[in-house]
Amino acid sequence: MKDSHQTIGVFVRPTHHQNPLFSELTQAKEWVLRLLEDEGFESFMADDNGLKDERLIEKAYAFLCLGGDGTILGALRMMHSYNKPCFGVRMGNLGYLTAIELNELKDFLQNLKHNKIKLEEHLALEGRIEEISFYAINEIVITRKEALGILDIEACVSHTPFNTYKGDGLIIATPLGSTAYNLSAHGPIVHALNQSYVLTPLCDFSLTQRPLVLGAEFCLSFCANKDALVIIDGQATYDLKANQKLYIQKSPTTTKLLQKNSRDYFKVLKEKLLWGESSSKKN
């Protein structure tokens, strides 16, 4: 039997057969599985709901995610409690988290076999609403459940009240997620390997409210004055009843991403955010 370093689990972006990407993803998946075999790796597929056989998860060294950032976010959350690294092969639009393009996979796998790949470990969030617990890779968002009215969110740091946000909601982002929804809401970019939380209000009623960066050693709690929604990485939702507590802390397990040794964080920012480009090129 091959050792765990030679076993790769494969996640593929869930796509309906009528989606224009369905045929492309199906062909890419088949090509990836053949390539893994040619390069000496054992492989197995994970379905949309993850894996029911924990023996396969334990056997795998890492998980290949074929799709965009949404695919890898879902896979990272599924695998978080198993402490397994993931790497993304871009088949989506943005591809901020994905490590490589499809045509780079062969070289990436060869480097993986020879330990010429770097492992990045990022802070993840652990949230809890009463008996329900969950992980977030990018962010946890508290937002209005009803279309009308202002949501009041009381925020506490280590059980001490420090602010009340009045508006559409609040983003609690990881450094890795600071370039996602947080950035769209005019929150700050925090280096992806930092150990901190980013709190960014959504359309706050007060002009004095500003985003806040807190050290990850703090435990946070939030409650709202009316029923609200808690959204995890833009992919999962939970109900937060009026005056019910949402607790957030640093997860004891990190988010693990395999990346090329040549990947440079600031170069990625420059490319994805078009820094240094003229306004005509951006448009």
From Swiss-Prot:
GO CC annotations, alphabetized: cytoplasm
InterPro entries: ATP-NAD_kinase_N (IPR017438), ATP-NAD_kinase_PpnK-typ_C (IPR017437), NAD/diacylglycerol_kinase_sf (IPR016064), NADK (IPR002504)
Localization (cell): Cytoplasm
EC main group: transferase
Similarity field: Belongs to the NAD kinase family.
Binding-site residues, NAD(+): D69, G70, N138, E139, K166, D168, L176, T179, A180, Y181, N182, L183, S184, Q235
Catalytic activity: NAD(+) + ATP = ADP + NADP(+) + H(+)
UniProt signal peptide: none
Name of the molecule in the record: NAD kinase
Stretches assigned to coiled coil: none
Protein purpose: Involved in the regulation of the intracellular balance of NAD and NADP, and is a key enzyme in the biosynthesis of NADP. Catalyzes specifically the phosphorylation on 2'-hydroxyl of the adenosine moiety of NAD to yield NADP.
Encoding gene (name): nadK
